[in-house]
């Protein structure tokens, strides 16, 4: 893990409540912790000039959507990002999807869900329920984009938006 990732990870508060959307009031408490962690992560990223995503959810906090972006050779590449909170959350990590990249890389499942199984999922399992959405972005989506997006650009499979 590089120093920038370690630094951004340390700035993300850990979650305490082990709850999923089916847990009623406990889920509301977990959702508050998730938002606090996301806000801290976004603020830290902005403070370090590494702002790279924005997220929002439906009212129940079960469906999340937003944008993520990656700069390559001074050009911004922006993507829609979405995921649902699994019923077994936080034991099961969310499956983060970049739908417009579906089928463009082998490190992706149907529907544009990024492949995180080898490196991220064991880390998530060791840190349940402390890790949350912000951690999934910092340790899952961020590193995935850092590897895959430049490769897709070099192969001519993605173009910057006008």
Curated annotation (Swiss-Prot):
<dbReference type="GO" id="GO:0071569">
    <property type="term" value="P:protein ufmylation"/>
</dbReference>
<comment type="function">
    <text>E2-like enzyme which forms an intermediate with ufm-1. The intermediate is formed via a thioester linkage.</text>
</comment>
<dbReference type="InterPro" id="IPR016135">
    <property type="entry name" value="UBQ-conjugating_enzyme/RWD"/>
</dbReference>
<dbReference type="GO" id="GO:0034976">
    <property type="term" value="P:response to endoplasmic reticulum stress"/>
</dbReference>
<dbReference type="GO" id="GO:0071568">
    <property type="term" value="F:UFM1 transferase activity"/>
</dbReference>
<protein>
    <recommendedName>
        <fullName>Ubiquitin-fold modifier-conjugating enzyme 1</fullName>
    </recommendedName>
</protein>
<dbReference type="GO" id="GO:0061709">
    <property type="term" value="P:reticulophagy"/>
</dbReference>
<dbReference type="InterPro" id="IPR014806">
    <property type="entry name" value="Ufc1"/>
</dbReference>
<dbReference type="Pfam" id="PF08694">
    <property type="entry name" value="UFC1"/>
</dbReference>
<dbReference type="GO" id="GO:0061657">
    <property type="term" value="F:UFM1 conjugating enzyme activity"/>
</dbReference>
<keyword id="KW-0833">Ubl conjugation pathway</keyword>
<feature type="active site" description="Glycyl thioester intermediate">
    <location>
        <position position="115"/>
    </location>
</feature>
<comment type="subunit">
    <text>Interacts with uba-5.</text>
</comment>
<dbReference type="GO" id="GO:0005737">
    <property type="term" value="C:cytoplasm"/>
</dbReference>
<dbReference type="GO" id="GO:0055120">
    <property type="term" value="C:striated muscle dense body"/>
</dbReference>
<comment type="similarity">
    <text>Belongs to the ubiquitin-conjugating enzyme family. UFC1 subfamily.</text>
</comment>
<dbReference type="GO" id="GO:0031624">
    <property type="term" value="F:ubiquitin conjugating enzyme binding"/>
</dbReference>
């Amino acid at each position: 893990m590089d120093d920038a990732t370690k630094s951004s990870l340390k700035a993300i508060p850990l979650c305490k409540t082990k709850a999923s959307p089916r847990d009623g009031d406990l889920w509301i408490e977990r959702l508050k912790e998730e938002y606090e962690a996301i806000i801290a992560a976004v603020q830290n990223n902005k403070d370090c000039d590494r702002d790279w995503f924005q997220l929002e959810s439906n009212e129940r906090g079960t469906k999340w959507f937003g944008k993520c972006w990656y700069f390559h050779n001074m050009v911004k590449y922006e993507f829609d990002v979405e995921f649902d909170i699994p019923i077994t959350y936080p034991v099961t990590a969310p499956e983060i999807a970049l739908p417009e990249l579906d089928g463009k890389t082998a490190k992706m499942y149907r529907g544009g869900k990024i492949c995180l199984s080898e490196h991220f999922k064991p880390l998530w399992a060791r840190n349940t329920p402390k890790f949350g959405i912000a951690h999934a972005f910092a340790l899952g989506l961020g590193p995935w984009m850092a590897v895959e997006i430049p490769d897709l650009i070099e192969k001519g499979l993605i173009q910057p938006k006008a």
